Every structure is written in C-alpha cells, then in structure tokens.
C-alpha cells in the first residue's frame, strides 16, 4: 500500500490519510485497506467511509481501543494485495444529452471550443472511476473527465436540479441522484432512480466501481423511464478484470471477461 498517516476523528473514528493527491493508485490503496480490514473481522469496527485520499474507519471504543485499531490497520496494510486481479464492476448509466435534458450543453461546448456533439462524444467515451460518494445520497465523485470538458460552475446556482441530472463542474462530472439546488453545468439526464432507500442496496454502485455513460435518444429515454417506473428495467453492470496499471480514464488495465449482470 501507499504510505499513510493516522489521525483521530473524535472518539469513535480514525482517518487513514494517504498522499495529498487524487490518483487511481491511491484509490486502489484505500479499497485494498478496506477489504483487508473487513477480511480480518476486527472486533469493534462498525463501518468505513472511503473518500478521495482517506479511509475513515468507525469503531466502538467500548469494544476496541484507538491503539488496538492502530495496530490492526498496520497489520492490514501489510497484507498482500488482492486487487491486482480482482473483478471490478462497470455500471452503465443511460443518458439523454442536450435539449431540455441538458440546458448547459452549449455553455460547456462554447467553453471547450467544441461542438455540442463533440462534447457528448468525449463525455460518454471514458469509464469513470468512482472515488467516493457524498454531498447527496448516491452522488458520485468521478475521475476521468476529458480535461478539455472542464467547465466552471454556474455563476448563479439553480434552486432546483432534477434527479438524474448529469453535470460538469470544474474537472469533475457527476449525477444528481435526488432533487437539489446546485451550480453544476447540466448536460444530460438519466431516467434511472439512483437513490432507492426502500431497497436493501439503495445504490447501483459503490466507491471503487466504474461508471460508463451510454447515450440514448429522447424516445429511448422515455422507454427506459417507463420500464423504471414499472420496475422492469435491468441496469447493465459489466464485470471485468483490473490489472496493476489500470486507471480511471479508460479501459487501460481492464480486461473484458464477457460477463455482466442486471439490477432492477
């Protein structure tokens, strides 16, 4: 694993802090440490929150002390990596770009000095690594946006952004899972319900997964939305192998094993 430092976060959490940069290798170290700690079944650990460069480990101080958890984290960091050949998931998100679904697509195109069609193509081509979830339930912070598409936030945020809105802000792209105010440049919309609190698994994805945006027409959007409303739509989740040199911007280091799954 990459080098890290430990910081107390109150009396029932530890922040495991890696290098001060956003990097796929750091993300793999975070995912590996979390997996190692889970497999150790350390008494007293109550949960994990992975982020860009930290893993917050929550614990019950009655069951385990800070010092004991420090030792457990150190032990977990020494375990051999299992992520080099681990299967990773690519969750396919259908998106209708532009028009009423993407009111800021022209803004992004003008800023990038591209046509709207070129913006759309550059946006849906990569596989985006999910570094973390935050801000809203199921809001994904993604790595891998084409640098030319980086666009500042709106000068005046909107008071209401619809669930499923796909946007760009600075060097990041993401999806609003629920209605919210926000200042991201909205370029498209997915008909999927990304936050399903009534389900055992409320999200289709987790930190460490990838997202791929699949462009769809207005007609396809409405058809998918109808199936989602009726509970018939299956989200396509692709399974691939990731190697040590895998990154977040494309399929380098990811080998296709031809498998996939669906989820309502």
Regions found by a protein language model. Give the residues of each.
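Glycine-rich active-site loops that engage anionic ligands at enzyme catalytic sites
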Residues: 1-264
């Amino acid at each position: 694993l990459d080098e890290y430092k430990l910081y107390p976060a109150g009396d029932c959490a530890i922040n495991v802090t890696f290098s001060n940069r956003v990097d796929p290798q750091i993300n793999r170290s975070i995912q590996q440490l979390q997996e190692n700690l889970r497999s150790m079944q350390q008494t007293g650990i109550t949960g994990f929150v992975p982020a860009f460069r930290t893993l917050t480990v929550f614990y019950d101080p009655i069951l385990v002390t800070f010092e004991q958890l420090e030792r457990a984290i150190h032990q977990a960091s020494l375990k051999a990596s299992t992520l080099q050949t681990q299967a990773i998931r690519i969750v396919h998100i259908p998106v209708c770009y532009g028009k009423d679904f993407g009111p800021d697509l022209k803004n992004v195109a003008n800023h990038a000095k591209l046509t709207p069609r070129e913006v759309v193509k550059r946006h849906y081509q990569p596989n985006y690594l999910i570094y973390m979830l935050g801000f809203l339930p199921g809001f994904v912070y993604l790595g891998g946006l084409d640098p030319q598409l980086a666009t500042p936030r709106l000068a005046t945020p909107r008071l209401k952004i619809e669930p499923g809105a796909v946007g760009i802000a600075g060097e990041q792209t993401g999806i609003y899972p629920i209605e919210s105010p926000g200042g991201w440049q909205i370029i498209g919309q997915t008909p999927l319900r990304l936050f399903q609190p009534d389900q055992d698994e409320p999200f289709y994805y987790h930190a460490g997964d990838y997202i791929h945006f699949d462009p769809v027409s207005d007609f396809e959007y409405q058809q998918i939305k109808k199936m989602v409303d009726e509970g018939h739509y299956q989200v396509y989740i692709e399974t691939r192998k990731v190697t040590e040199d895998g990154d977040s911007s494309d399929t380098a280091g990811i080998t296709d094993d031809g498998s996939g799954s669906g989820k309502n």
